[in-house]
Amino acid sequence: MKQEYEVLFTPWKIGNLEIKNRIVMCSMGGTSIFGWMKPNHFDKEAANFLLERAKNNVGLILPGIAPIRDTMGGKWLYQNKGKFKELKEFMDEFHKTGAKMFIQLTAGMGRSMAVNDLMVKMIKNKAFGTIAKPIFDMDYICASASATPNRWADDIYSRPLTVVEIHQIVEAFAKTAKLCMDAGVDGIEVHAVHEGYTLDQFTMKYTNQRTDEYGGSFENRYRFPVEIVTAIKKTCGDDFPVSLRYSVTSKTKGFRQGAVPGEDDFIEVGRDMEESEKAAKFLQDAGYDMLNCDNGTYDSWYWAHPPAYMPENCNLSDVSHIKNFVTIPVVCAGKMTPSVGAKAIKEEKLDAMGVARQFLADPTWVTKLMEDHEADIKPCIHCHNACFNMARYEGTANIQDLTDAIHMARCAINPCTMQSKKYKISKAAKVKNIAVIGGGFGGMESALVLSQRGHNVTIYEKTDRLCGIFNEAAAPIYKEKDRELMEWYKREISKYPITIKFNTEIKDIHTLQADEIIIATGSTAKHPPIKGIEYSIEATEYLSGKEVGDNVIIVGGGLTGCEIAYDLILKGKKPQIVEMKNDLIAVKGVCLANSSFLREMLAFKKTPIYLETMLLEIKEDGVVVKDKEGKTFDLKGDSVIVSIGYKPTPLVKASRHVHLVGDANEVGNLRTVIWRAWDVCMKL
């Protein structure tokens, strides 16, 4: 391995427990070994997921959160002894890898619970809620420190947990931790004084207006997590390590309002650095053996789950600062890179590096790092298209697919993640000659799957390069991981006997001598029938490098339009956005961490945004628009970029031996492109 990475593979201790290296796989929703949104079962898919990562040289593994009280059914976790019997059998196998595992137990979500439309009905309709209560007790699930508004639904409020309920939760943590310890689990992580979950809601003034022993003073607000670690230590002994998931600062300006990077002049309503310095020491003295750190709350979700737009290692400076106030180990997560993580550990600014979603994209990345095959690591691109499908548009949380609520920890670019039964390579019964028309991501993924199954594959690409429209999509300054993924695909393609014919446009599929044909010809931009359209350029033209002036009007406030606006800001230009809908990025399926960052960054940069506004005409020096009141006015600009979406451009229709993949089938995102390729190619 590279010399700079050697420090990542040195041992360290949490209490008296030695961990073999400094790489921590952080918890991700959907990877709970006790299942997620499914009561009374040990999740074998998650167990296999965790074991594969352990076999690939991870030091410490933290499975997804396990609610101390089942979300469905309301049963206390410690009451289900069968789960812990299976857990013990798993731990015996797990420990053969040399890795260690802490189970992450959560007190709950509180106001951060992502309520969908059905859940809202359970809350608002008392009769319906009573009927549903044995399955979904929404009143309890959403209970918080005080009556506070739900993050996802404008008119839903949490009720305060009672003191009796708090004591029950504390007792449940202790009982569950003992069962975990007896099953061979190496430690517990308490979830969480972090991200605005239930325990965090108790610690912060803006979500805690209690007047009893759990509200008011600093000590009272932090009493709940202190009582939990005290109870665990009393039951399991002082040597049983307990970690705390901890957000150093909240980066929160108010309900549903975060502070973006660079926005330093704001009033923190959550935990500021001064309080955090005190809290970290207070929590250490209470008995916690490690702080697993980042920043943010659900109101500033992009800090805890940083999308592509956030800087790499975005939480490191705050987390390394807090290490000065404790003597227990400190871990930092948040787009951590091995080089920066290793440097911080060497300089004693951190004890270990926390990584999460990179393990979804490539389960073997740590092994590749050790063996000096860094170029072969498939990079996470921070898209959140499959691992975090919770979006917020038109009032409540929504998802791409109902099943996503059960298993979130999937991966747009690695369908096998947490779906090993559905997506796995199997050799074809009969080897075929297969033509793939189009060398974009849909075409390349199809070719890789088909080649691994034993087929003879030829890609026909009309240009002189692979990756299709992703060449443009990956152009913005902050899309460096997208560009890394493009290079990964090119290298991966070269490892297989796949023929590529560049500068070859297929106009008649009948000229191909192929048993099966994959149409991966992508999509083209929509063109509005607007006077003066010749004075504008398409989004893809800008992303291809076409020059624009300093003042740029963007027609279309969807995801691409907003990403272009942010790219322009980073280049020192002044964008303004015209959008017909009543909000930016008004679509389902774009993760709230992504969309809220763009909305709030554009607001911070004072970008003019014209919602519910129609484009009437494009001129040499700007556009003519009409607002929702019917008022017509001019907007001045040096350049106009039109970004109103795309439409499929299949070469031919699908038939028995002709199959559509990617945007040629239906315009979507990278997840729909990659997964569709597998769905089609595993059947050939």
PLM features per residue range, with description:
Residues 413-428, 494, 502, 521-572, ...:
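Glycine-rich dinucleotide-binding loop and its adjacent helix/turn
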Residues 334-336, 357-358, 523, 645-646, ...:
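Active-site metal-binding loops of divalent metal-dependent hydrolases
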